[in-house]
Amino acid sequence: MSKPDRYVSFVGIDGDSNARKLVALLRRHIDDPARTNRFWELFKDKLEKINKPDETSGFSQDELYLVHAYINNIRELFETYDDQPALALLDRIEAESC
């Protein structure tokens, strides 16, 4: 199978699944009291509101949306802790889905 072209179609790209995997990698860091801060605590609140539009003024958020919206913050965290597998997945998501 050829490499999917995000500018033509998202066929063959599982952005939602990749974003959920990335959030799981992110949670390993931000759920650690020594690595979290006010920003990440607020981010976790956003994660708790996924697929709850009644709590987000009618706007349905998902993991992929949050990854895209906070990609630079997420990248900085992974770079800080030299999390190479997470950075590789983040690069893939950025290339395929952003």
From Swiss-Prot:
InterPro entries tied to this protein: CowN (IPR024899)
One GO process term, biological-process aspect: nitrogen fixation
Matching Pfam families: CowN (PF20543)
Assigned keywords, A-Z: Nitrogen fixation
Role summary: Is required to sustain N(2)-dependent growth in the presence of low levels of carbon monoxide (CO). Probably acts by protecting the N(2) fixation ability of the nitrogenase complex, which is inactivated in the presence of CO.
Protein family (similarity comment): Belongs to the CowN family.
Protein name: N(2)-fixation sustaining protein CowN
Organism in which the protein naturally occurs: Trichlorobacter lovleyi (strain ATCC BAA-1151 / DSM 17278 / SZ) (Geobacter lovleyi)
